[in-house]
From Swiss-Prot:
GO terms for biological process: translation. One of the primary rRNA binding proteins, it binds directly to 16S rRNA where it helps nucleate assembly of the platform of the 30S subunit by binding and bridging several RNA helices of the 16S rRNA. Forms an intersubunit bridge (bridge B4) with the 23S rRNA of the 50S subunit in the ribosome. PROSITE patterns: RIBOSOMAL_S15. The keyword Cell inner membrane does not apply. One of its GO terms (cellular component) is cytosolic small ribosomal subunit. Pfam families: Ribosomal_S15. This is Small ribosomal subunit protein uS15.
Length: 89
């Protein structure tokens, strides 16, 4: 399992708008980012795992689409999220 339920709940509590909020874009992007970071570390020791690399590219695309949606809907929340996650430089 990539992410323990405790870690997932801590991310949901940190980025959610209210208790039990799993659908807001901030939570979804934060969960995707955690999975992407895990897979990035995985590829440092498993360089030829091409099947998982395909999954990583899919996750990155999902995160990009969610960030694009959030930027279109609410720029302030988008900027706060990318700063908190450290996604853009």
């Amino acid at each position: 399992m990539v992410m323990t339920p405790e870690k997932k709940m801590s991310i949901i509590e940190e980025y959610g708008q209210h208790e039990g909020d799993t659908g807001s874009p901030e939570v979804q992007v934060a969960l995707l980012t955690a999975r992407i970071e895990y897979l990035t570390e995985h590829f440092k020791s498993h360089k030829q795992d091409y099947h998982s690399r395909t999954g990583l590219l899919k996750l990155v695309g999902q995160r990009r689409n969610m960030l694009k949606y959030l930027a279109k809907k609410d720029v302030q929340r988008y900027r706060a999220l990318i700063q908190k996650l450290g996604l853009r430089k």
